């Protein structure tokens, strides 16, 4: 059971109508001060749409890397019409140290998040070949089996990190029973964390921390809510509340240095 918990920040909502690199970078750096050790970013254009053009992504992470030791995690996912090669574009960006890897198809609301096995394998190989550490995003129990089967072909860095994603309409519900079921399928020598999409409270996150999650993702990509009735306009308020929750369970908020050691990520 982990006595230190990594806070992973996902600061930009999928429906954000405007993405300004300097503003996002400032928001990220404020969250570093509050306890974030990883930032999870999709490649978006100034109107917030997913794109293979990495210019604005690179403009966002440059000041973050210059002013902090925060781990940069690029997303290779998101519901879009991009090819898997286009989705893998940020893997070539300087400074990318982790990548979220989606390991199966799933219904997300009214959309199908399409991740067939050949695409998963393609993305996995590019991640491993570049020395990037994958975070395996698992929306359904079967996805855990998918990635374990892929180990026969691809030599993933150990320990593997599984992120249990709950709460999307059409996928696994955000319940304690679902969390326990998903956790039970993850190998005991692997690391795991949680993302609660559409979160209105911190109850499920608190349960995951108590169960030994080594990572919790928080931020506007998943929810603006700080409690059941209030939203916030700054990610840092969510990070601060999560840090307080972690400490309330007599655990420590992991530093970027600790997260790098745990995940086998070299210092820049």
Regions found by a protein language model. Give the residues of each.
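Alpha-helix-loop-beta-strand connector modules within alpha/beta enzyme cores
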Residues: 3, 49-76, 122-129, 180-189, ...
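Histidine-centered catalytic micro-motifs
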Residues: 20, 25-26, 38-48, 71
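Conserved, mostly hydrophobic/aromatic
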Residues: 24, 31, 42, 99, ...
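Active-site beta->alpha loop and helix N-cap motifs at the rims of alpha/beta catalytic domains
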Residues: 25-26, 50-115
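Glycine-rich, proline-tolerant flexible connector loops at the mouths of alpha/beta enzymes
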Residues: 37-60, 108, 165-166, 223-228
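Catalytic alpha/beta core domains of metabolic enzymes, predominantly
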Residues: 98-220, 237
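Mid-to-C-terminal alpha-helical segments outside catalytic/metal-binding sites
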Residues: 240-268
